[in-house]
Design a protein with these regions (language model features):
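Acidic, low-complexity cytosolic segments
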Residues: 1-183
Length: 183
């Protein structure tokens, strides 16, 4: 599932975290341009962010009320929702449609909440300050979810183990035990 852009901001459009992901074709073009494309890329990223904000801003009120919002630009889907004081906006295409992107956002938000507040995070609100305190772990979590623009993992328990850099054998044992129990 290709993801192109992830933006986490507040209601004043202040960027907290932003990631752009290149498609394999874009990566090849950038490598073959001998570094001449960095200015073009920076301009594109700025324009895309402005476009995403202008397209989604009219529905931020609904997103802050917990209703997922969807927009499309050509073959790209843009899905956004808030959690606490933060707005999560993701763009994807192909098999990463609005339903797939909703699932990715749910995982990202759950990883953010669990990283910032632990497992007992019901009713706790995400904001810029709490995200800054756990910024490193959150970035590792995002890399576990979206690796090089491709959705790699949506299992929150596995992602949390990765952010702690612990041995995965415990996760594998627990997963096998739960799998046998359910089947």
């Amino acid at each position: 599932m290709p993801v192109h852009h992830l933006l986490i901001c507040d209601s004043h459009e202040n960027t907290i975290i932003e990631r752009f992901y290149l498609t394999p074709e874009e990566r090849r073009k950038e490598l073959s341009s001998n570094g001449n494309s960095s200015e073009i890329r920076a301009k594109y990223m700025k324009q895309w962010k402005e476009r995403v904000i202008s397209l989604t801003k009219p529905t931020w009120g609904d997103a802050y009320r917990g209703i997922y919002q969807v927009a499309t630009v050509g073959d790209k889907f843009i899905v956004h929702i808030s959690s606490g004081k933060l707005l999560f906006i993701i763009t994807g295409s192909e098999d990463c449609d609005d339903f797939g992107l909703k699932e990715v956002l749910e995982t990202i938000i759950n990883v953010f909440k669990e990283t910032c507040y632990g497992k007992k995070n019901v009713g706790k609100m995400l904001d810029e300050e709490i995200v800054k305190k756990s910024f490193g772990k959150l970035c590792v979590g995002l890399e576990c979810i979206i690796d090089g623009g491709i959705v790699d993992n949506l299992n929150v328990e596995f992602i949390m183990l990765q952010t702690k850099l612990k041995d995965l054998s415990k996760f594998e044992r627990d997963f096998k035990r739960k799998y046998k129990k359910n089947h």
